[in-house]
Amino acid sequence: MRLLFGDAAASARRPEEYEARYPRRALPKGAMVTRYAPSPTGFMHIGGIFVSLINKRLSLQSEGVFYLRLEDTDVKRAIPGALDTIVDSLARFDLSPQEGVLRAPAKDGDASSRGEFVQQGSYGPYIQTERVEIYRDYAIDLIRRGFAYPCFCTVEELDAIRQEQMALTVKPGVHGRWAKWRDAPLARVKEALAGGTPFVLRLRAPDDVSGRVEWKDGVKGVISMPVNDLDTILLKSDGIPTYHFAHAIDDHLMRTTHVIRGDEWISSMPLHLQLFRTLGFRPVEYAHVPPIQKLDRVEEVDPETGETKVSDARRKLSKRKDPEANIAYYREIGVPETGTIEYLLNIANSAFEDWRKANPDKPYSAFPLKLNKLAPGGALSDMVKLKSVSQAVVSRMSAEDVYAQGLDWAREHDKELAALMERDPEYTKRALGIERGGKKSNKRITTWPDLRPQLFFFYDELYDRVDALDFPENVPEGDRQPLLRQMLDTFDPADSKEAWFEKIRQIAVASGYAGEVKQYKASPESWKGHVGDVSMLLRVAVCGTRNSPDLTEVMAVLGEPRVRARIARFL
């Protein structure tokens, strides 16, 4: 052993020492310990938020623990700043873990600064490159027990093996007669070491690989696959473990109960279960979630008829081709974080939609998410559904929440609007509070970019920029000034909505407009237009647009001086 690991072999801890160092967690019966274990290799994928959401909800519902572990053993693929993206994205979506890699509070309470990374919890380190000694000690134990061996195959030799296997159409990899160092005599190993030949440590797969391995997946049910027959690499030549080896040790020692991850890992399950048993661990419960997918329009030309056939093909969201794969995209287009979360809950479990309708005032966290109710098939990315959910989420928000979250978005994406919103926060909140609350709450805001068209007329700087006003067609130019003059003369901010509309109706009738829309429709040739046209004339004059909330409430927020000044512009 000393030949392979030097002095480290003598000081290696035994598995029982690690069992004592990382005892079973003192949690209630049925508590789930789950984790999100990303690699720092790029932007935060929507699938990462999806899986984190499921993991955190299930752990909290069961009084368990959700933790973050950084799987950074693939140093070549690591991207600077990726850890910032992971930790900050989880925080933004209220998915921060209870333990693992976290960001410390900002110094001196400065919310604009970001704290340093810390590792919180008793089962760390939570960064794999800081656990190399643990993996090495378990590797030494496997060698002692005859379940691992050093392999000195060069890159050229491995390539030759691959070429031969391709020619024979057999499974590629180190197995069977191609496992050239599996039973190498000690003298040969010493010779390779003396020559300075680098080596990797490989798992010794079972001699009998004719059977199958079967397990019950938490999402997909019972799955059966051939037993793993590859002598998989456990430690690379630099002593860094592979994902397969590290995850088995980490999930056992961190006392993970459920590994919930993307279903691209199903093909590795025979190896992972084999590793757990070889290491002497009880396997965790596995649940594989299908990826969010997208439809691609595919055109194929029939070689016989020459006709073009069009079909839809499913594929998972691509990091390279699909902007919606990046969680930052949802922020950019202005979907509130809760909107994205509720959209993902719809994908996870279709029952959420009916639950939300029955419980409009409850937080999404009250929804009883169940592992065995997760959709086993891949859901399609649906931007129309996303915006529908977003609109519903915003409609349930208080004016204070709309202000806070909308301002947070505007500071990054619409700085002019943000400055106007911040100039008088209470004024802006009153504007946002119009038609908010109740069963017919304002649904004019779907995403945060909608704030500008819904708020611009409350700010003179933006209202004054409107060039072409869309006055109603049924009110000829010659009628505009007289009608607006009468409305200005009779305007009283103390009027109720009903009293003010009655004044407009009387002005309309006296000027040749029908007092009711149905009256106009019954005999359009008898009238210039109807009271709605006259009311719209006032709306356009005051707001600069036909699209605004209740005009009486808008004018109350604008205030009498501003309303009178705007009407007077057209006299």
UniProtKB/Swiss-Prot annotation:
Entry annotated with the keyword Glycosyltransferase: no
Alphabetized InterPro entries for the sequence: aa-tRNA-synth_I_cd-bd (IPR045462), aa-tRNA-synth_I_codon-bd_sub2 (IPR020751), aa-tRNA-synth_I_CS (IPR001412), aa_tRNA-synth_I_cd-bd_sf (IPR008925), Glu-tRNA-ligase_bac/mito (IPR004527), Glu/Gln-tRNA-synth (IPR000924), Glu/Gln-tRNA-synth_Ib_cat-dom (IPR020058), GluQ/Sye (IPR049940)
Entry-linked PROSITE patterns: AA_TRNA_LIGASE_I (PS00178)
A single BP term in Gene Ontology: glutamyl-tRNA aminoacylation
Gene Ontology terms, MF aspect: ATP binding; glutamate-tRNA ligase activity; tRNA binding
Enzyme class at the top of the EC tree: ligase
Motif interval(s): 'HIGH' region: 38-48
Keyword terms of this UniProt record: Aminoacyl-tRNA synthetase, ATP-binding, Cytoplasm, Ligase, Nucleotide-binding, Protein biosynthesis
Catalysed reaction, written as an equation: tRNA(Glu) + L-glutamate + ATP = L-glutamyl-tRNA(Glu) + AMP + diphosphate
Positions annotated to bind ATP: 319
Cellular component per GO, a single term: cytosol
Extent of motif 'KMSKS' region: 316-320
Subunit structure: Monomer.
Record-given protein name: Glutamate--tRNA ligase
Lineage: Bacteria, Pseudomonadati, Myxococcota, Polyangia, Polyangiales
Gene from which the chain derives: gltX
